[in-house]
């Protein structure tokens, strides 16, 4: 396969995004250092292309290049940042899309060892490659709930949550990523975030098994420790986080109850949810006191719950990048097929 040196160097992104997608599935966390070398490479290659085009023979090519780069940088980057601000993207997802906007503003070209065949096969009229990656990522993401539903159907699992989740035994919940799809009132897409659950358990120094063993006592604010633990970030212990399954500092008998006496107004705070969220110096992934209370109520009553692992967005992004580099723009092809492009 042949191409320009900048386009060949851009292929370094494929294994990097593949590794990031794997990390997203396994840990839901991608280190910031993953993107730094690739971002530096992206800037260098963009300047390289700009110099090549600017010293080229035609002004038309220069204008097209500038327009496409302007769309990529001026639309995809703000869009990614906006989705991150409203919670639609995680931090790693937003950084990855911003990187795509700089690394792939225009279509790369890779010539195969066959006459007149070059990848990507299907290009768009606008010619902004980062938009192609974005649209292919969205299409790949649409497949996810269909695959989840098919898996649940094959296992005989029927529920309102079957398109976005799967059932998990409650004792195993703290070893999962995602959020509960249940509240005391039934199906609820806005259930408790499991990272926030791990933070809460770490903060109060007990395991979910301890909570389930004596829910009536643990629900009382007087059962909270006077000196809570650092809640951490809710990551699993195998990913470098603090364990939320019992390997934490249990409060002593002298610690329990003292704070409840000092804060009589907290008596109407089941599970100490408000105190937990007031005590930590950062957000517990947007969790409200009521979400935490409802989630704990479900977890002490049920033996199995439905959870949504969420879409590890770097996975469809990696798939979208690979499809974009080989086939091209799937959405554009579909629109052409129905006469809309």
UniProtKB/Swiss-Prot annotation:
GO cellular-component term (any): plasma membrane
Domain of life (superkingdom): Archaea
InterPro entries reported for this sequence: Preflagellin_Peptidase, Preflagellin_peptidase_C, Prepilin_IV_endopep_pep
UniProt topological domain (Extracellular) ranges: 25-29, 87-92, 156-312
Reactions catalysed according to its record: Cleaves the signal peptide of 3 to 12 amino acids from the N-terminal of preflagellin, usually at Arg-Gly-|- or Lys-Gly-|-, to release flagellin
GO biological process: proteolysis
Membrane topology: Multi-pass membrane protein
Ranges in the topological domain labelled Cytoplasmic: 1, 53-64, 104-126, 325-341
Keyword Methyltransferase: no
Enzyme Commission number(s): 3.4.23.52
Region Disordered, residue ranges: 219-264
Subcellular location: Cell membrane
Keywords: Archaeal flagellum biogenesis, Cell membrane, Hydrolase, Membrane, Protease, Transmembrane, Transmembrane helix
An annotated Gene Ontology molecular function: aspartic-type endopeptidase activity
Site (Essential for catalysis): 24, 93
Function as written in the Swiss-Prot or TrEMBL entry: Cleaves the N-terminal leader peptide from preflagellins.
Similarity section: Belongs to the peptidase A24 family. Archaeal preflagellin peptidase subfamily.
Protein name: Preflagellin peptidase
Source species of the chain: Haloarcula marismortui (strain ATCC 43049 / DSM 3752 / JCM 8966 / VKM B-1809)
């Amino acid at each position: 396969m042949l191409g320009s040196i900048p386009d060949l160097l851009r292929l370094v992104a494929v294994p990097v995004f593949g590794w990031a997608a794997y990390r997203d599935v396994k840990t839901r966390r991608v280190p910031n250092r993953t993107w730094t070398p690739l971002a530096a490479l992206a800037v260098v290659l963009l300047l390289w292309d700009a110099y090549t085009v600017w010293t080229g023979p035609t002004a038309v090519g220069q204008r097209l290049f500038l327009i496409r780069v302007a769309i990529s940088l001026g639309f995809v980057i703000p869009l990614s940042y906006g989705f991150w601000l409203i919670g639609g993207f995680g931090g790693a997802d937003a950084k990855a899309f911003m990187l795509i906007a700089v690394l792939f503003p225009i279509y790369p070209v890779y010539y195969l060892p066959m006459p007149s065949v070059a990848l990507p096969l299907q290009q768009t009229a606008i010619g902004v490659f980062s938009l192609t990656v974005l649209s292919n990522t969205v299409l790949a993401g649409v497949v996810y709930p269909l695959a989840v539903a098919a898996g649940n159907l094959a296992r005989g699992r029927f529920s309102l949550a079957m398109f976005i989740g799967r059932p998990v035994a409650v004792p195993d919940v703290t070893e999962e990523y995602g959020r509960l799809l249940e509240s005391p009132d039934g199906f609820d897409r806005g259930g408790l975030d499991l990272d926030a659950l791990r933070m809460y358990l770490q903060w109060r120094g007990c395991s979910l098994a301890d909570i389930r063993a004596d829910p009536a006592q643990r629900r009382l604010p007087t059962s909270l420790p006077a000196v809570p633990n650092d809640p951490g970030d809710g990551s699993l212990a195998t990913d470098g986080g603090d364990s939320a399954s019992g390997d934490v500092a249990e409060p002593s008998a002298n610690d329990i109850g003292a704070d409840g006496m000092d804060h009589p107004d907290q008596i109407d705070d089941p599970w100490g949810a408000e105190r937990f969220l007031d005590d930590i110096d950062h957000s517990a992934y947007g969790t409200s006191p009521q979400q935490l209370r409802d989630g704990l109520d479900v977890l002490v009553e049920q033996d199995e719950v439905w959870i949504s692992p969420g879409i590890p967005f770097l996975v469809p992004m990696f798939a979208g990048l690979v499809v974009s580099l080989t086939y091209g723009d799937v959405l554009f092809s579909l629109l052409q097929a129905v006469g809309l492009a």
